Amino acid sequence: MSDTNHSTLKVSDFSFELPDELIARYPQEQRSASRLLSVKANENSIEHKHFKNIVDEINAGDLLVFNDTRVIPARLLGEKVSGGKVEVLVERLLDDHRVLAHVRANRAPKAGAELLLEGHVKITMLARHDALFELKFEHDETVLELLEQYGHMPLPPYIDRPDESSDKERYQTVYNREPGAVAAPTAGLHFDDEILQQLRDKGVNSAYVTLHVGAGTFQPVRVEDINDHVMHSEYAKVSAETCNAIKQTKASGGRVIAVGTTSVRSLESAAQASTNESIEPFFDDTNIFIYPGYEFKVVDSMITNFHLPESTLIMLVSAFVGRDLIMKAYNEAIKERYRFFSYGDAMLLQR
């Protein structure tokens, strides 16, 4: 591949101009009605398809690895009891009553400050940990119960509209089961029950990881030399059952196909932490940063959405099929007016 020297890659090498109207503000009426851009590095090819074609692209004996995290309604609006508006975005659940959260206010609350959110939810500020605040929910109900009742879905900043009741269903995969994410693993949004059944009928296998996507996924890279970037941490879980499914798939000549960059990062984190040449169960925080030059240890193909310019995720997909091919694919997608970002269209990357 005629890619730029990896050691000299700059953030600006991953920039592209996106017309504002190509940012998808709403999902397609039907999940699987999205388009699919198929990119094959070994053939240096780009093909335009529909997501329904995904069944034809995946073979019996292949393993799809899904992230089963559930997005929580993590955004709460209200005021400090002492006065002044405040917005809380829960980043991580610590236990049934404590969280780490981002807090937006004219003046940051100090330890002991009390907040009243959505007119009902009483919160005490316990401590500050760098950019995050440790908050205690002063209720008998659990944090999750309170968020389900009063919280707003934490739509990404570029969707640029208030959340609506339909987002509670659509900004969520159909196979979610582990609450804790504050952003959806968006490649999975295209799968509906019908496509999942067609894949099962074909003999395609499934496995699950859990990575609770944090708000840090939307943080821009603030350094020009990508070697200087420090990734945010997220909790990932790769079970023994999933590791065994991967080993069996590889042994029988099938492909491990990661659904979404969060599944990629979970699997590659588990492989990196392994004490042998294989993959071992992983239950830990990961801040893995995958960019060109990275040697993939587990993932053979991936399904992903289109990512923000200069983001760590466009760097990850560039690491997989090459920066030049990714930038060419993105430019073609813009020309063909694909829908971008969380509620947008999908890519299938093979090599």
Swiss-Prot record:
Pfam families in the record: Queuosine_synth (PF02547)
Recorded superkingdom: Bacteria
Per UniProt, the enzyme's principal EC class comes to transferase
Q: Per the UniProt record, which EC number(s) apply here?
A: 2.4.99.17
Q: Which Gene3D superfamilies match?
A: QueA-like
Task: Tell me what reaction this enzyme catalyses.
Answer: 7-aminomethyl-7-carbaguanosine(34) in tRNA + S-adenosyl-L-methionine = epoxyqueuosine(34) in tRNA + adenine + L-methionine + 2 H(+)
Which cysteines form disulfides? none
Tell me where the transmembrane regions lie.
none
Key word Cytoplasm present: yes
- Subcellular localization, as worded in the UniProt entry: Cytoplasm
What is its pathway? tRNA modification; tRNA-queuosine biosynthesis
Chief location of this protein within or outside the cell: cytoplasm
Q: Which GO terms describe its cellular component?
A: cytoplasm
Keyword field contains S-adenosyl-L-methionine: yes
Keywords assigned: Cytoplasm, Queuosine biosynthesis, S-adenosyl-L-methionine, Transferase
Write out the GO MF terms. Answer: S-adenosylmethionine:tRNA ribosyltransferase-isomerase activity
Listed GO biological process terms = queuosine biosynthetic process; tRNA wobble guanine modification
> What family name appears in the similarity comment?
Belongs to the QueA family.
Task: Say what the protein does.
Answer: Transfers and isomerizes the ribose moiety from AdoMet to the 7-aminomethyl group of 7-deazaguanine (preQ1-tRNA) to give epoxyqueuosine (oQ-tRNA).
The record's subunit annotation is: Monomer.
What is the protein's given name? Answer: S-adenosylmethionine:tRNA ribosyltransferase-isomerase
Give the species this sequence originates from: Idiomarina loihiensis (strain ATCC BAA-735 / DSM 15497 / L2-TR)
Q: What is the lineage of its organism?
A: Bacteria, Pseudomonadati, Pseudomonadota, Gammaproteobacteria, Alteromonadales
